[in-house]
Amino acid sequence: MMTLLRSFFVLTTFLFLSCNSSNEISKPNIVLFMVDDLGWQDTSVSFWKNETKFNRLYNTPNMEILANMGVKFTNAYATPVCSPSRISLMTGMNAAKHRVTNWTLNPNKKKPAEINHKIFEFPDWNYNGLSTLDSISNTIYATPLPQILKDNGYYTIHAGKAHLGAIGYPSSNPLNIGFDINIAGHAAGAPQSYLGVDNFGNNNSKNKIWAVPGLEKYHGKDIFLTQALSEEVLEKLQKPINSKSPFFLYFSLYNVHAPLMEDNRFVEKYKNIGLKNSEIKYASMVESMDHALGVVLKELENKDVLKNTIVVFMSDNGGLSAVAREGEKHNHNYPLKSGKGSIYEGGIRVPMIVYSPFHKTNIREINHPVIIDDFFPSILEFTKCEESSFVQNIDGQSFVPLLNNETVEKKPLFWHYPNWWGPIGPGIGSYSAVRQGKWKFIYFHDTQIIELYNLEKDISENNNLISVNTSKSQLLANVLTKYLKSVDAQMPYNKITNSIVPWPDEHPLFN
């Protein structure tokens, strides 16, 4: 893998010359490496100004290589839970617009935590997920990203977690949304087991819903799920590589989602430094994830296609912190507050790296805020497919100009979660929020509490400025409300007041 680093500067020089001496270049390959529940500080790559204890704990050498080759995005955001991020990725739409605002699984059902809630009756959101047809109830009708790429000549591979549609609905199978190949993707958002000796959960009839499909040749073997997926990815890549066809690989790992389980290839070092049991499991899963990244990068380099491949690394939400971890809850994403499910930074700010041999810049870090909605137009621009037609109106804005060091207006970023996740903790609940520049405004639906933070000075969100900067608060409340109304965003019904939750700009502080 060190060859990657040694060849990087030679490679970019070669590409600069070749790309400028030809009127037409071949379509770039795209590798989108999506990790599940990986926190902003769960790697040995630091995305903050200071290195933290977590950066020193976890071992992710291949992420380090990718970051040295590419560009770190230090203000990258997803949604607080998984399915909304994945639908935004596939459609370019914000969750408030596509209305898949919570995680999907069972058809025609809200989540258990939403049913018979003591305060709220939650809206009839799109719990059946994505759809390529406009006639299916409680789905978002859209033209998915892989379908557009496939229609433009790309060989499309899905590997790992899908979680795009409820059980029995077409989008639960990635083959129905434009992928040529589906490796182990289905409706569920977590595996029953990561272990081949457990048949990845397929020998547990009680919880069959979580069993990972399609990896039967690894059943009974001493192999971790991530390793099995990596081997399948390498096999499926050979067809487009050998035929010199452009490919889109969406490698969507189940790691590091619970249940926490040891990848025995990586546990010894963490046992030797005295970590407790669940943290040993978690650290081994982080390293397992990184190893999978390295396997793919090495194969691309060995087959001489990395020079024509854009690699994007991202997590689907903030790091797990409310459950399953050792130590005090909600403190595993320091300096960020809280974790998965929360509207605080620990729940939505995620690690992101982009390597593109086609964008010649000396910058190694981009601080411009971006969000998962932006991936759809960015990948279309990367692949010269931005003129393609699609049925949805998108919210995303391409981040490709940032890689060319161009000045881009800092648009507001929006989050909307008119739902209930289940676990209790800071910032976990039903809420809406906006970030504009350095300012972040949060509106909690149940308590009607509003908060304002200057993220440049207070990344940990400890100093609520709502009472000292009412004008900025009102401005952001207006921006948030205008957007929510423009997309006809759903709001919960308050059973105590017998009314729909008011819009943010209707808060008593502003009236």
What are the residue ranges of the model-derived segments?
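A long, amphipathic alpha-helix that forms part
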Residues: 224, 228-241, 268-309, 326
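Active-site segment of extracytoplasmic enzymes that catalyze sulfate/phosphate-ester chemistry
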Residues: 32-33, 40-143, 148, 202-203, ...
